[in-house]
A protein has these predicted regions:
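Specific transmembrane helices
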Residues: 25-110, 129-141
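Membrane-embedded catalytic scaffold of the fatty acid hydroxylase/desaturase
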Residues: 81-93, 105, 112, 116-290
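Short, strongly hydrophobic alpha-helical membrane anchors
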Residues: 1-20
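A membrane-cytosol interface segment of integral membrane proteins
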Residues: 210-212, 284-332
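Short, charged cytosolic
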Residues: 1-3, 46-61, 146-162
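A transmembrane-helix-recognition feature enriched in membrane-embedded lipid enzymes
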Residues: 72-75, 268-279, 308-311, 315-322, ...
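Membrane-helix interfacial "entry" motifs
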Residues: 14-21, 63, 67, 71, ...
């Protein structure tokens, strides 16, 4: 009974954390996203000499063809399952970023000896830490994303996310548990090692500037266009901005069924690692015709059970030698 109580309690707190003020789906984040979307909508309407009406804005932001699509209902089911049901499993199976940080400090101390903190201004140390933590987060995200696209047995799990035929904010957690755990742990290791090295060098002042208890850079991203990555709203960045940041259009190209867009734009908030490793594709300013989904295998993802079970089967097939049947065996 104690286990069941802990399971229910931890799951409840995990779910609630996503909706707290500092959570990704907290009221400040979602309200600011709506205001940002309104700003984009109003600016475009006025550029065409048309009034910006609230009713039209809401209709364009939440079109019936998307809100009532079967893909959206699957988004809802997987979103609820991953947050409210499986949340505790993720917290138990995830590496502790703070633990990695402390282990890194200990390892550096053993290898290099005690180190007096560098006497730099606190604001400068925090700025360096904020940027370094963001880059470490993004590198881990890019690397994990690259692996799930590069190796077919991992792609089978990532297909769950790409199976979305339309995209909404909830598509973010249209993910297989294997993928979620992989990303969470990669990010924990990357950011933990980075923060450990910075703490060893600069002392306890090495922590990020925060907004609503999160890295200020990531939170600003979520409070503006971050939630629009998975949407039908075409907002693209060109020039230097398009090389530094992931616009919603960057990620919409990533989900495209056009082979020219495959394996592009693997970053989360930043485009710098895509730029560095040759996986960047800058979207055009005007809306490109983009279709989403994974084609003929969509039927594998029309129920929650299939969505979670089929990737294991298909992934295993990549390691199982194919025995020729009489019909497929080569003929002399």
């Amino acid at each position: 009974m104690e286990f069941l109580h802990r399971l229910a309690t931890d799951d409840f707190h995990y779910a609630v954390a996503n909706f707290k003020s500092g959570g990704p789906y907290g009221i400040p984040s979602l309200v600011c996203t709506l205001l940002f979307a309104w700003f984009v909508f109003a600016r475009r309407r006025r550029a065409r000499g048309r009034p910006a009406e609230l009713k039209l804005f809401l209709r364009s932001l939440f079109p019936r063809r998307i809100m009532l699509h079967r893909s959206t209902f699957m988004d809802m089911r997987l979103w609820i399952l991953n947050i409210a049901v499986l949340g505790v499993a993720y917290t138990w199976l995830a590496v502790s970023g703070l633990g990695v940080r402390d282990a890194t400090i200990g390892a550096l101390t053993r290898m290099l000896g005690e180190h007096a903190p560098t006497p730099w201004p606190l604001a400068l140390v925090m700025a360096i830490t904020t940027l370094s933590a963001l880059l470490a987060y993004e590198l881990a995200y890019w690397f994990g994303h690259y692996l799930f696209h590069r190796f077919e047995f991992l792609w089978e799990f990532h297909k769950v996310h790409h199976s979305a035929e339309v995209m909404t904010t909830l598509t973010e957690l249209r993910q297989h548990p294997v993928e979620i755990l992989a990303f969470v742990n990669l990010i924990a290791v990357s950011t933990g090692v980075t923060l450990g090295a910075l703490t060893y060098a600069f002392g306890p002042g090495a922590h990020s500037f925060t907004l609503l208890n999160a890295n200020i850079a990531l939170m600003l991203f979520l409070m503006t266009w971050g939630h629009l990555r998975h949407s039908h709203i075409w907002l693209s960045f060109q020039g230097l901005a398009g090389h530094l940041f992931q616009s919603p259009a960057h990620h919409q190209l990533h989900h495209s069924t056009n082979p020219e867009h495959f394996n592009k734009n693997l970053g989360f908030a930043l485009a710098v690692w895509d730029w560095a490793f040759g996986t960047l594709r800058i979207p055009t300013k005007t809306c490109e015709v983009v279709e989403f989904g994974v084609g003929e295998t969509h039927g594998d993802y029309d129920t929650v059970l299939r969505t979670f079970a089929r990737p294991f089967q298909r992934s295993a097939e990549h390691f199982t030698p194919v025995v020729p049947t009489p019909e497929s065996a080569p003929r002399a």
